[in-house]
């Protein structure tokens, strides 16, 4: 599928996307996808990266990128952005700011590691996800990756 039809298909798939509280099983998802999708494809992993997910995701992405182009789209939590913008008036504010900064740095470090290994990545607020995904797809297509 190419061109506008591909963009429309991506948008239609994202329309009903809802977050859950269940932990993702990245290795299982990768195994199932590799068994079903034999031809090269663009695999978009929509997630909210957390410390406990990185090892499983690393293994899944490594397996997937052998056959497919991979785009990791991580939704950034708005509450962390809000915490980082609040003024610091005391110890509890300083601790909250430090925790937010540590969380951001870990995400950025992991996303940069993925990028260094040839994986396209997004780190975007949920409200921008659909537009950013379409733009990333178009950029990947223009670069011959999708």
Feature annotation, model-predicted:
Residues 1-146:
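Exposed, interaction-prone extracellular/peripheral surfaces
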